[in-house]
A protein has these predicted regions:
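Catalytic histidine-centered segment of alpha/beta-hydrolase-like enzymes
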Residues: 220-234
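Catalytic nucleophile-loop/oxyanion-hole region of alpha/beta-hydrolase
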Residues: 68-98
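Short, surface-exposed "cap/lid" segments of acyl-processing enzymes
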Residues: 23-55, 60-64
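Conserved alpha/beta-hydrolase "acid-adjacent" motif
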Residues: 195-201, 225
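Hydrolase active-site cap/lid region
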Residues: 121-162
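N-terminal cap/lid segment of alpha/beta-hydrolase-fold proteins
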Residues: 1-24
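Short beta-strand/loop motif that positions the catalytic acidic residue
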Residues: 182-183, 188-190, 194
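Alpha/beta-hydrolase fold nucleophile elbow
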Residues: 98-109
Length: 243
């Protein structure tokens, strides 16, 4: 059963999304979306994969960060440090669901970087990273530098007002700082033709995690736009979560 859910973060923003809870589900996947993305994600990947999970008896939670999608706030309210807090809150709410015994975390792009930061052996049982943006600090700097600056200090970027606070707060983090905190199983997927996030970042994650597997998907770009690319992405991830 899919139902709309919402909960308040500590900064007063209501986070909104969907909970898909199959009957007798004992495991749940918490999804973390990418930069300028949302709980459905590019090409419907999060929605599609959540439906596939449900058919296999696994629950899922897909939320928008504050300032994104249907959650409270505007994109100019979006801060990296608060997004990290949002992710911790999502994990907390997932653990509170009756009957759930295992919590898995899946992050795409920016969400992959955040997932790698928040995943720890106490709160997460398995970790899935799709094209994790380990270079997000550098990307944020470039986004901010290369777009028109507004009087309030923010930058206007292709329809999105990027807050200087996002850029400031992301510098508080190393995108690889959380690797040491997670020793359980990790599944990483990355397109070989990704022009947005260098595949070498996934190779580094794979090398630094103690219990990791990497699937490099031929011809796939950052969005996994072709059916065969999508099927491999979903297939590798589902097989990993079911075993």
């Amino acid at each position: 059963m899919v139902k709309a859910i919402e909960f308040l973060n500590k900064h007063g923003f209501m986070l909104r999304g969907f909970l898909d809870l199959p009957e007798n589900a004992e495991a749940i996947v918490v999804f973390l979306h990418g930069f300028t993305g949302n709980k459905t994600e590019h090409a419907g990947h999060f929605r599609n994969f959540s439906r596939l999970l449900s058919k296999n008896g696994i629950a899922s939670m897909r939320m928008d960060y504050h300032g994104n999608g249907e959650s409270d706030g505007e994109f100019y309210d979006f801060r990296f440090d608060w997004a990290v807090e949002d992710a911790y809150l999502m994990l907390e709410k997932a653990r509170e669901i009756k009957g759930i015994k295992k919590v898995y975390l899946l992050g795409f792009s920016l969400g992959g970087a955040i997932a790698s930061i928040v995943a720890n052996d106490k709160d997460v049982d398995k970790l899935v990273l799709w094209s994790p943006a380990g270079s997000m600090v550098e990307h944020a700097d470039l986004f901010y530098k290369n777009h028109k600056h507004l009087e309030n200090g923010n930058a206007y970027m292709a329809g999105f007002e990027l807050s200087y606070k996002f850029v400031e707060t992301i510098h508080q983090y190393d995108m690889f700082q959380g690797v040491k905190n997670f020793t359980k199983e990790v599944c990483i997927c990355h397109g070989e033709k990704d022009l947005s996030v260098d595949i070498n970042l996934s190779r580094r994650y794979n090398k630094e995690y103690k219990n990791s597997e990497l699937h490099e998907i031929p011809s796939a770009g950052h969005g996994y736009d072709q059916v065969e690319e999508r099927d491999k992405l979903y297939g590798y991830s589902l097989d990993f979560l079911l075993r």
